[in-house]
From Swiss-Prot:
Biological role stated in the UniProt entry: Associates with the EF-Tu.GDP complex and induces the exchange of GDP to GTP. It remains bound to the aminoacyl-tRNA.EF-Tu.GTP complex up to the GTP hydrolysis stage on the ribosome.
Name of the protein in question: Elongation factor Ts
UniProt KW Transferase keyword: no
Cellular component per GO, a single term: cytoplasm
Keyword line: Cytoplasm, Elongation factor, Protein biosynthesis
Location of region: Involved in Mg(2+) ion dislocation from EF-Tu: 80-83
Family indicated by similarity: Belongs to the EF-Ts family.
InterPro entries for the chain: EF-Ts_dimer_sf, Transl_elong_EFTs/EF1B, Transl_elong_EFTs/EF1B_dimer, Transl_elong_Ts_CS, UBA-like_sf
Molecular-function GO terms, alphabetical: translation elongation factor activity
Presence of the UniProt keyword S-adenosyl-L-methionine in the record: no
PANTHER family, per the entry: ELONGATION FACTOR TS, ELONGATION FACTOR TS, MITOCHONDRIAL
Gene name per UniProt: tsf
CDD domains assigned to the protein according to its UniProt record, in alphabetical order: UBA_EF-Ts
Localization of this protein: Cytoplasm
Length: 312
């Protein structure tokens, strides 16, 4: 083992695509003989993971995990929905979501985290690729914090507990009763999952990207001018349409899907009276499987997934 350097382990990993721990073991089993180590990995069926990593991972699962005032949601892709139903894959995804709690949501950070088996998340996924026979990748992750308070979750059409095609986290910041907050948070998470009347882009008006708001304002103004309206009327029309726009995309302004007569903001105000403490939304995340990936030619999609998950 004395002749086995970190550089040699890295070289073997680069050639085979196998995790660092397995590469180190292969070199140890072959007394540091590089080519023999490659053959050893091939015989173990591990080096095939490198070729599989080039294949498209379009399916998979979105998983959520919460712990008091912290929560995380991750998307792990696989090639087929058949693998998404595989117990080993689901167990791995569940652990990855749990490991993401308390972090920043950075994919590279999560990949470097240690699993219960002692390997890193990245190496564990590489081993699963070889074991299950399909490419898979941790594509993205996000976290929500509400302290004091709770982070509630909801998974739409779950494939297993806390994982499915759409995962939502909602942080409710308050000193109120945690059980009541959790119940309210889950209902709001269900609202966010529904995306009605549109998928919310921010908690409040100030959180809407100024570029998006400016573009909408410009479009509304052009429409009014093309209708021959004078400038004094144009401005009033634009303001009215912007209010409608915010009612569609700002969470607090949206009509609550379970009680359309009240907005989310009004629901929170009522909850605050019931709890005897203010209730605010610290943040929310809605993650849908495959969202934001352009499904063009297969090689382009594979590149997008690889880029999003930090793979080279």
């Amino acid at each position: 083992m004395a002749g086995i350097t970190a550089a040699l382990v890295k070289e073997l990993r680069d050639k085979t695509g196998v995790g660092m721990m397995d590469c180190k073991k292969a070199l140890g089993e072959t007394d540091g003989d590089f080519e023999a180590a490659v053959d050893w990995l091939r015989k173990k069926g591990l080096s095939k993971a490198a070729k599989k990593a080039d294949r498209v991972a379009a399916e998979g699962l979105v998983a959520v995990a919460t712990q008091g005032g912290q929560g995380a949601v991750v998307e792990v892709n696989s090639e087929t929905d058949f693998v998404a139903r595989n117990e080993k894959f689901q167990t791995a995804v569940k652990e990855i979501a749990a490991l993401a709690i308390g972090g920043s949501g950075d994919v590279a950070e999560i990949k470097a985290a240690s699993t219960s088996g002692g390997s890193t998340v990245e190496d564990h996924l590489t081993n699963l690729i070889a074991t299950i026979g399909e490419n898979m990748a941790l594509r993205r992750a996000a976290v929500v914090v509400a302290e004091p308070g709770v982070v509630a979750s909801y998974v739409h059409n779950p494939a297993a507990t806390d994982m499915g095609a759409i995962g939502v986290l909602v942080g409710l910041q308050s000193d109120g009763d945690k059980d009541k907050l959790a119940e309210l948070g889950r209902k709001i998470a269900m609202h966010v999952a529904a995306g009605s009347p549109a998928v919310a882009v921010s908690v409040d008006v100030d959180g809407v990207d100024s570029a998006i708001a400016d573009k909408e304002r410009e479009v509304f103004a052009d429409q009014a001018r093309q209708a021959g309206k004078p400038d004094s009327i144009v401005e009033k029309m634009v303001e009215g349409r912007m209010r409608k726009f915010y009612e569609e995309v700002v969470l607090l302004k949206q009509a609550f899907v379970m009680d359309p007569d009240n907005t989310i903001e009004q629901v929170l105000e009522a909850a605050a009276k019931d709890l005897g403490a203010p209730v605010t939304i610290s943040g929310f995340v809605r993650m849908a499987l495959g969202e934001g990936v352009e499904k063009g030619p297969e090689e382009d999609f594979a590149a997008e997934v690889a880029a999003a998950s930090g793979q080279s």
